[in-house]
Amino acid sequence: KVTAFTKDNIMKMTDGLFHKVFDEVAADYPGIEAEHWIVDIGAAKLADTPEAFDVVVLPNLYGDILSDVAAQIAGSVGLAGSANIGHDVSMFEAIHGSAPRRAGQDLANPSGLFLGAVQMLVHIGQGDVATTVHNAWLKTLEDGVHTYDIHEEGVSTEKVGTAAFAQAVEFLGRGLDDLF
């Protein structure tokens, strides 16, 4: 199911156009359920019952805000990758951006960058490499190697900085690569 969030009841031209194009594109994919929500009630539903949504498409302003909300519901804004897919150009990033407040402190959780890279690798047809990176990231988390934002006493085995977390993923990725 794909859900569009807009505020086309008020923003009739801009969000109205987004809603219209969403409906046109959805008609090209009759096997995928498509629905529309007004962004304010959709945001409340997303915060309360995130599992009710599979894929949510939004204009950039709402998407930038709600992707951070959804990531925080999942545990940290540092965990989610993001993809902006266009006809000719696509962009992949961590949803939290560059974390300038964390610059030079070895604190930022690089998970969003890893997951943005995984999305990019899938997008460019490098599924095997994406799987290796994703599995190495998952194994790092499962091993309890966590950055400050997700560190939890009794669950985490080690609190690490940005560089050490990235090195742990890289190390496991090399080991997983040898297995396949």
Walk through the language-model features, giving the residues of each:
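Short alpha-helical patches at coil-to-helix transitions and adjacent helical residues
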Residues: 15, 110-114, 162
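Glycine-rich phosphate/nucleotide-binding loop
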Residues: 46-146
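Glycine-rich phosphate/pyrophosphate-binding loop and the adjoining helix
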Residues: 1, 8-10, 138-180
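Glycine-rich phosphate/diphosphate-binding loop of Rossmann-like nucleotide-binding domains
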Residues: 1-40
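Conserved acidic
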Residues: 14, 125, 129, 161
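Hydrophobic alpha-helical scaffolding
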Residues: 8-12, 32, 36, 55-56, ...
